[in-house]
Amino acid sequence: MSHPLKAWFQCHAPQLRLAVRVAVAGVVAYVIGSAVHLPQVYWATFSAVLVTQASVGGSIKAAVDRFIGTAGGAAYGGALGTLLPHAEVQHALLLLVATLAPTAFLAAIRPTFRLAPVTALIVLFGTALTDLTPLQAAIDRVFEITAGSLIGIGVSLVVLPARAHDLVGEAARSVLVLLVELIAFVNASFQQRPSPVDVDDVRARLVTALALVETTAEEARRERRTYLASEPDPSPIARTLQRLRADIAIFGRAAVETFPEPIRTRLGPHFAGVADTLSAFLLKTGDALAHRTAPPELGDVIKTLDLYAAEMSALRDAEATRQQPTEVAGSVFTLSFGLQQMRADLIDLRNRAAERARD
């Protein structure tokens, strides 16, 4: 296999595994549904495909949501269809309103029920071409969708299974890579050099990456609640990443100021040292989170932070900051505060990575 093709497969391995699971789930659901003579086997096939997610925890959540929405909508639609006449057009319109309004409202306030309006309609009007009563149709739909959902979960557990706890580490690494790009922008601004990255694009991708960490962490918590995993709670990782982003935002806003001499000349090399060691630590920690290995030590980062703090103290003793405008002095101290705040969060990040290490 050529190197570019191999690299492409490695880069898209999670997506390829998901594609295989979805295909297997659909085929298995159709075969089993046909073998047991489900009334409408395609509902089981649809459910198996929709339930199969990127992780086992995601599949469980999708299955639970689908079952709750389907059962609620089918029960409501079946009851209305049985109790209320709808042969006449005017009756059908009233029944349509009575069906959609409550279920749509419920779906709006409880996203778990987002399938309820559709299922209720299917139960009500899907019987027009069959001899089934609405109640019989409701029972069939719930049975078919439940069967498909269980098949989807089973395939997620057996075929190239992906645990959300492992995906959390990969998602966290993506966030840390983007934080390193932000640090490169901040350092370039401090040194009054052109930015090596498009900061607006980085910030937009960072929002998406952090949201993915939150979603994956929730799926991992669901795996823990269903006893499919006994890993540490991933929630602290998501919170630590949010705090690190806030830390970088704090000292980043201060660093983009144009500092006069001698502040920029004296602090610039030390800030560059912090940026270099911090970036190296975050990248190595991201790899450790993704591969479940021991994280790197913080010694180099702490050393450069201490050197920066010492130079800042020397500037303060020399009253260099008092000679500057209030805005400049405020930015200098904000920069120092952000860096010191980040020290505690870096220690927390390393501890969280160490908890997840398997070696």
What are these regions (language model features)?
Residues 23, 35-39, 244, 301, ...:
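Short linear sequence motifs
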Residues 241:
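Positively charged, phosphate-engaging catalytic surfaces used for nucleic-acid and nucleotide handling
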Residues 238:
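A contiguous, well-structured pocket-lining segment that forms one wall/lid of small-molecule binding clefts
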Residues 1-210, 217-218, 351:
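A transmembrane helix-and-boundary motif of multi-pass membrane transporters/channels
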Residues 1-17, 31, 167-234, 246, ...:
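Long, hydrophobic alpha-helical segments that serve as membrane-spanning/inserting helices
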